[in-house]
UniProtKB/Swiss-Prot annotation:
Coiled-coil features, chain-numbered ranges: none
Native source species: Helicobacter pylori (strain Shi470)
Catalytic activity: Exonucleolytic cleavage in either 5'- to 3'- or 3'- to 5'-direction to yield nucleoside 5'-phosphates
InterPro entries cross-referenced by the UniProt entry: Exonuc_VII_L (IPR003753), Exonuc_VII_lsu_C (IPR020579), OB-fold_nuc-bd_dom (IPR025824)
EC number of the protein: 3.1.11.6
Subunit structure and binding partners: Heterooligomer composed of large and small subunits.
Listed GO CC annotations: cytoplasm; exodeoxyribonuclease VII complex
UniProt keyword terms in alphabetical order: Cytoplasm, Exonuclease, Hydrolase, Nuclease
Disulfide-linked positions: none
Stated name of the protein: Exodeoxyribonuclease 7 large subunit
Localization in the cell: Cytoplasm
One BP term from GO: DNA catabolic process
Gene Ontology molecular-function annotations: exodeoxyribonuclease VII activity; nucleic acid binding
Alphabetized Pfam families for the sequence: Exonuc_VII_L (PF02601), tRNA_anti_2 (PF13742)
Length: 420
């Protein structure tokens, strides 16, 4: 038996291992995972309960990995055994890696969902409300697709007042993600302008999971989440549930269903308006009847108040007349009282006057007798001043006197008085 050097035995082992284990599938738990930022290579160990083997995933293969490799994952690696002669080490050079029991796409999608959930992409608080009566809707789809034709037909039937604008985009295959992302951004760029869209609908009909899978892409999710315009995802059929359905403000099972959800039914609203009109008419009649009854009540009250007001005014006038009458009565009574007092005074003093009158009559008779017995010279006369006899010696210039005898009476004014 030949004696081999360390290098020789390691080289033979390398050749044997690489030839024998050219392609292998090995399952185990990922541990000691290290991803070099510069090179992009990933180094880790694959272990089970009894053993460990080192693995390497070079950058080219790592970029094709559909999910994020994490510590503790149960995976199945596909690759070949390679040996490093200087150290006598061997490892699995991984070409592909899949999660154990589930596909890599499924795991990748679950990982992405968790990432977006933590960022709040699915929170209801971040969802925009559906517009009640859309006037302008952007539909991101293929302009030659059956989905677009169905959507136009349903929209024209349900709500013909709405303007449906097709933004043509690739809806499957290579370039689909970028085309949809750009279309969403374009439609949303009108936000806040007079040509703004009330809603953006991303729509395509059914297809294979491979055809629909682009709508699980993170870039489309980002575009929908960042849009300021209300968005809807209408991809595939009822059974197809994609990431875009979770991120959009509202999900529709099909493109046709999107139009049924988004647009109100003109027929239903016409029926509602008829119902509103009937209710309004009934309410108006009831209100009119109530107001009429109230008006009649007010009119009756007004008449009653008018009569009462007139009665009150008449009562005031009567009261004033009563007061005036009382005042006049009192004034008349006071006048009569005064007059009565005067009459009473005169009545009380009438015997005195009668006595004086009788005396005066006696004096007058005596005077007449005196005149009759008095012998006056011919053409003589009595002289009096102020109805009183006065001697000539007492007269003075300017006195007014009266001259009288049995036959006549005369008035005179003294011009001068000469003493004898």
């Amino acid at each position: 038996m030949d004696v081999l050097s360390v290098s020789e035995i390691n080289a033979q082992i390398k050749a044997l291992l690489e030839a024998t284990f050219l392609q292998v599938r090995v399952q185990g738990e990922v541990s000691n995972l290290t991803i070099h930022k510069v090179s992009g290579h990933a180094y880790f160990s694959l272990k089970d309960s009894q053993s460990v083997i080192r693995c390497v995933l070079f950058k080219g293969n790592a970029n094709r990995l559909k999910f994020a490799l994490k510590e503790g994952q149960e995976v199945v690696v596909f690759g070949g055994i390679s040996a490093y002669v200087p150290r006598g080490d061997y490892q699995i050079n991984c070409f592909e890696i899949e999660p154990k029991n589930i596909g890599s796409l499924t795991l990748a999608l679950e990982q992405l969902k968790e990432k977006l959930r933590l960022k709040g992409y699915f929170d209801k608080a971040n969802k925009l409300p559906k517009p009640h009566f859309p006037k302008r809707v952007a539909v991101i789809t293929s302009q030659n697709s059956a989905a677009w034709a169905d959507m136009k037909k349903i929209a024209s039937k349900r709500w013909p007042m709405c303007e449906l604008v097709c933004i043509n985009a690739l809806m499957q295959g290579e370039g689909c993600v970028q085309s949809v992302v750009e279309s969403i951004a374009y439609a949303d760029s009108f936000h806040g302008t007079k040509n703004a869209f009330d809603a953006i609908v991303v729509a395509r009909g059914g297809g294979s999971m491979e055809d629909l899978y682009p709508f699980n892409d993170e870039k489309i999710a980002d575009a929908l989440h960042l849009a300021k315009t209300f968005s809807m995802s209408a991809i595939g059929h009822e059974s197809d549930f994609l990431l875009s359905d979770l991120v959009a403000d509202l999900r529709a099972s099909t493109p046709s269903n999107a139009m049924e959800i988004l647009l109100p039914s003109s027929d239903e609203w016409l029926q509602r308006l008829d119902g509103f009109n009937l209710k309004l008419h009934r309410s108006f009649k009831i209100l009119l009847h109530q107001k009429k009854a109230h008006l009649e009540h007010l009119e009756a009250s007004l008449k009653r108040l008018s009569f009462e007001n007139k009665h009150h005014l008449n009562a005031l006038k009567l009261e004033k007349l009563k007061i005036a009458l009382e005042n006049k009565t009192l004034e008349f009574l006071r006048f009569k009282k005064t007059l009565l007092e005067k009459i009473s005074t005169q009545t009380l003093t009438s015997p005195f006057l009668q006595t004086k009158t009788e005396r005066l009559n006696r004096l007058e008779n005596a005077l007449k007798l005196a005149h009759a017995n008095l012998k006056l010279p011919q053409f003589g006369a009595f002289v009096s001043k102020n109805n009183q006899a006065i001697e000539l010696e007492a007269l003075k210039r300017g006195d007014k006197i009266e001259l009288s005898n049995e036959k006549a009476r005369a008035s005179a004014e003294i011009l001068s008085v000469d003493r004898v």
